[in-house]
């Protein structure tokens, strides 16, 4: 998709704050500091539309980005961030679960994992949750440029096995540096919009 117009419409915490729209939505889920903001910026060809932070846990709301009057990316808080209180993490969990299970406009979830590391229990639980609710999902393994190409397949196998990955789902190696995987991710989105 050729992206020229992107706008952050609202940062929401409750359903009544979600934008009233019929446009399809794609949620981006992943651990804190896994590269969600870099993924968004790469997909929409912007350097800093989604703020990138060295501090995990920066996103604390559901951020609705309208793209080309055609769809929304919804950046959800990173899960598994230890430096916020348990109460705060539980609030984020409820906010994410409410959005994912009740939003009619949601067409799919882009689950982002770090190719360099074995997925955590939180990653596994998120994937299992999406499968349980029969929500279309693509797993995007970011930061491929940070490890030697010779390790890509080995690391991808570890990610798939740890998640108990469904071979019917799409799995993409991604790099915000080289733009590898960008076209495959857009293909998943386009298919869900048809």
UniProtKB/Swiss-Prot annotation:
<dbReference type="GO" id="GO:0005829">
    <property type="term" value="C:cytosol"/>
</dbReference>
<dbReference type="Pfam" id="PF01926">
    <property type="entry name" value="MMR_HSR1"/>
</dbReference>
<dbReference type="InterPro" id="IPR019987">
    <property type="entry name" value="GTP-bd_ribosome_bio_YsxC"/>
</dbReference>
<keyword id="KW-0132">Cell division</keyword>
<feature type="binding site">
    <location>
        <position position="37"/>
    </location>
    <ligand>
        <name>Mg(2+)</name>
    </ligand>
</feature>
<feature type="binding site">
    <location>
        <position position="59"/>
    </location>
    <ligand>
        <name>Mg(2+)</name>
    </ligand>
</feature>
<feature type="binding site">
    <location>
        <begin position="75"/>
        <end position="78"/>
    </location>
    <ligand>
        <name>GTP</name>
    </ligand>
</feature>
<dbReference type="InterPro" id="IPR030393">
    <property type="entry name" value="G_ENGB_dom"/>
</dbReference>
<keyword id="KW-0547">Nucleotide-binding</keyword>
<keyword id="KW-0342">GTP-binding</keyword>
<comment type="function">
    <text>Necessary for normal cell division and for the maintenance of normal septation.</text>
</comment>
<keyword id="KW-0131">Cell cycle</keyword>
<protein>
    <recommendedName>
        <fullName>Probable GTP-binding protein EngB</fullName>
    </recommendedName>
</protein>
<keyword id="KW-0460">Magnesium</keyword>
<feature type="binding site">
    <location>
        <begin position="57"/>
        <end position="61"/>
    </location>
    <ligand>
        <name>GTP</name>
    </ligand>
</feature>
<dbReference type="InterPro" id="IPR006073">
    <property type="entry name" value="GTP-bd"/>
</dbReference>
<feature type="binding site">
    <location>
        <begin position="30"/>
        <end position="37"/>
    </location>
    <ligand>
        <name>GTP</name>
    </ligand>
</feature>
<dbReference type="GO" id="GO:0005525">
    <property type="term" value="F:GTP binding"/>
</dbReference>
<feature type="binding site">
    <location>
        <begin position="142"/>
        <end position="145"/>
    </location>
    <ligand>
        <name>GTP</name>
    </ligand>
</feature>
<dbReference type="InterPro" id="IPR027417">
    <property type="entry name" value="P-loop_NTPase"/>
</dbReference>
<feature type="binding site">
    <location>
        <begin position="174"/>
        <end position="176"/>
    </location>
    <ligand>
        <name>GTP</name>
    </ligand>
</feature>
<dbReference type="GO" id="GO:0000917">
    <property type="term" value="P:division septum assembly"/>
</dbReference>
<comment type="similarity">
    <text>Belongs to the TRAFAC class TrmE-Era-EngA-EngB-Septin-like GTPase superfamily. EngB GTPase family.</text>
</comment>
<dbReference type="GO" id="GO:0046872">
    <property type="term" value="F:metal ion binding"/>
</dbReference>
<keyword id="KW-0479">Metal-binding</keyword>
<keyword id="KW-0717">Septation</keyword>
<feature type="domain" description="EngB-type G">
    <location>
        <begin position="22"/>
        <end position="194"/>
    </location>
</feature>
